[in-house]
Swiss-Prot record:
Similarity comment: Belongs to the WD repeat RTC1 family.
Gene name of the record: RTC1
Keyword Cell wall biogenesis/degradation part of the UniProt annotation: no
GO cellular component terms listed in the entry, alphabetical order: cytosol; GATOR2 complex; vacuolar membrane
This protein's name: Restriction of telomere capping protein 1
Positions with biased composition (Low complexity): 32-46, 563-593, 768-778
WD repeats: 131-170, 176-215, 222-266, 275-314, 367-417, 432-473, 635-673, 891-934
Amino acid sequence: MSQPNSQGQSNLAKFAFNIYGTLSTNSSTPQSHEISPSSSLGSSRSNKQTNQYSSQETNNNRLSYYCEKEIMSLSQLNYPLSIGGYNGDLQHHVVIGGKNYLRLLCVSETQQRIISDINLLESKSIYNSRATNKLINVNTIKTYADTIAAGLSNGVVLIYRVSPNGQSKVVGKYSDHSRTINSLDFIDSENQLLSGSQDGTIKLWDLRSSSTKPVMTIQANLHSDPIRACQYSRHSAVRNKICVLSVHDSGALCKFDLRTKNGGKVYSPEKKWNLHTGPVLSLHIHPEKEYVVTGGRDKRISVFNYGDGQSRNTPDSLINTYGPVVKVRWSTYANTKEIVEEFEENQQPNPNPLYNYDIACSYLNDDPTIAIYNLGRKFIPKQIIHSKKPVQNFIWAQNNSKSRKIWTLSKPNSFNSYNLYGLDDSDVSRPIEDLSNVAMTWDNNNDFCAVSQARYDYDLESFGNAINETYEDNYDTERNCSLDNEEFVHSQANSLTASPIEKPQLTRSMTYNPVQSFSTFSPAPVARTATGFLQNEPVTPSSSSSIPNMHLSSSRPKLTRNTSQTTQDSSSSQLSSVIPPPSSSQTYSSPQYKRNQSSRCLNTPAYVIPVSIPVPSNDEYVFQKLSSESLVNIPDGFTLVDVCLINASVAASVNNNRTSQVWKLLAVSIQEEFESGSKLRRILGPETETVSKIPQEVHESLAKTNEALSSDIAKSNSVSSVLGNFVESFKSTSTSGSQFGKQNDKDDRKLQNKNSSGNLMDMINKASRNSSFSTTSFRLKEQERREHELRNTQNFRDENEKVSTHSKSAPISISSHPEDLDDENMSATNSAGLKSSPPSVGVSIPSTRTFSSSLASSPKSIRIMNGVNSNVARSQPSPPVQTWLKQRNFDVSNGVTMMGTSGLSLALKRNKTNEEGCEFVKVWKFKSLLRKSLDYAALQGDIIFCSTVALLFYDIVPDVISQFECLEWLSIYIEILQRKRLFVNAINVIKCATADIQEKLQKLYCSDLSLRFYCSRCQALLVNDKSKFSGKGEFGYWYCDECSRLQSQCVYCNEPCKGLAVTVGLKCGHQGHFGCLKEWFIEDQNTECPGGCDYQVI
């Protein structure tokens, strides 16, 4: 029963198909506003479906089409179709393929809208009534006339034929490949097809034959080297050859000649080149010449001449990109039509055909951009297409107007068209318009070079030829002027120093040289011709200041990129733009000394200005020592204070005294914060385990001590700050200041005699000694010291209260000292600011006419306790005396009774707050000092100090050092280290950075390194395919298949150095095995090189 039912359903399906046909095939009616279509059920459904998936952007008339399935392959069908009311007018169409998806999109004549779409998977087949509906994956597509070839991921090649009315049929199915089809190409007609597969073979199919077997099989090697792309060279047909190019995963470019006599099988290419390191993913042949462009995973685009008359093994031109290149294509049409802007000159096509065609490339790893390059300016993209989603594939579109259009496929299901001539497309950028006309860069010798270049005057052949044109009358004038300046030349040459390369002073009207006293002069601006020679302009000494204006009537020569432009070996070449060369052997009739007065030369091409600035502080030895020996992390057993002191000693060893003092100041500040119980106590080192071992009783005792000291310390700090401000104001206005200064010096001397830490070095040494102890012992001693100070503070307070209560008119007590000092200008705050001052010091405060009588009539005994926490630079501003006077008058007027105390005593008892009730912040706190030191270092350009501080303190004080600042400093520092070839220091900086900073730095500076080894004799790339596949044994970089010679042999045993090799010396360059050299030098006790070069190693 089941068989008749199934047979009936199949017949019903066939009957329905014969009535309605394929909806997509019959839906070939254009839009209603263009031509009135015939009314039919199929056409109406097709229009609804087309409008559902296609959309048109009205801003820039961009064609967009959204598919219902994932797409990955793209091609263009150039065959006239008569669909609906179009009678052969639709000549350019799009073929899109993907996962179970293959459609033909009929595009309008203006290529701005989709007229109809045809589902090729529903086409008729010569093998069955309908093509198979199994799940297929179209990996590549190629078209020729009315034929469409589709390469599938299962190794099958399907051939479709499209009729003029839009209907299609499967006419061929070939399945001789075992893996995915990566590339397809037709040979001169629609009857011969090439297919390159992942299985490492290229097969030639005859589509006219009834056989499904290939006519020829091509293989680059005996092993299966996957083929990424292959293409037939139409230029070889002139020499009656059938040339095919292919690129492989091994990085090889192979050239095959299909005229073989080996029975339809080719196992070796005619020629083979290794242009890339790693897999080559794409190739495309130039439309006019025998040049091929290839792109690979090594982020390079190579342009190579594969003709028979060339013998080069390296690319003719190389373009470095920022990502792996997955697709590369020459443009379809030459650049004969350019958009001319107001500031751009109308340029004619370049006679070099390579410059007339652009190169477009797309990138791997889901990159959403397509870059368009031109070999005339290959260092920067001409245009960049920015897509909203990653680009899957692209082609240059052909059209009737020959405009520059690119069709793209974006992941997962979007087709878009971009017009590169359109100036209003926001998704197409032109990087050259965003760059400045003047650029500069530094080299490793602390010199820089500036280049001024017009935006659209680059590599103009006609301009280079015009520069070399000569005029005899100008030649005579120039030579006479040059001979008149001979004396000036010799005097100028004698005034220079005796250095190997003497550089003249840069005399330009707009240049300021702040260092005129140095004997090393900056070279003059160097103008270059198209051939790379210097363009000499003889001028008189009096007119040397008008150099920037000497090219107003004639153009400056253009910048050519060759190896000679970076080297200047004589002083005459550097004096070319200022004064004529002194040597009489110069040929003034040579082209580089002649000018051109043509109006074509009014443009100003690139102008090179090398400048040498002697900066004494920028020393290579100092930079290398600071970057190598400065600690950027905390080693085991050290604290942060120790690290700061070590960095201070490193800076002092290179006479960088200010940086050394800053490091010492940070160390003292960190120690001070630690002693005052600040939160920065944790930055002194990873000692949490030791702290946890302290008994509970000690913690409780410390807590009580800190609580008891908090109020007294605040009062003591207030007394110190108020007294310091009061005494300073008193010294500036009092007539008896010398007596006060003398007495104050006695107090200072008394403090210095009682404690040896009265200067900065003693404080640093003490901080270093304290930090070197263990945390337990240090804190126990700290507890005993604080308890002792607490008792002294309590006794001192009781004594003051007793004096102020029972002896209101008692004089101020003055502590005597047997010695006297003569330095009367010593600051009064020195005795009050030392870290380990005595418990109390008596100070005499004489009266002055500046203050009121009430303040001076009732002096009291004021004793100031300078404890451990009365540190250096703790001068918070106190309320002025006028504030106290106003408060006193207000209290008197209100009848408030006050004790007969002096205004200074009341001021000293005030809380350490301002008028708004906010606590005063010390400007010399650790965070404040750190921020100020970083600001100054950044202003001075001290990148080493900024980077070192960022590595040490970024995770400790994130509110002081922002993430942006840390990244900026470390990035600049790493770039400078890499430029100076200090790679170990650069890697150490990345390793010592915090996790979030390290992750971002690794993305920028820790990329994979690719090494390419070349033969030291024949300069060929060491691939060794012959040795690998012939079974001769292991061969690596020590052997070359091209010249059959070993590369590196041991100088002692004459065997290949396959592993670790030791170089005897940099002068002789001989190398050998470690064991061999150990036997020669250590066991045999030889001192010279075993190679016989008489080089004394020891």
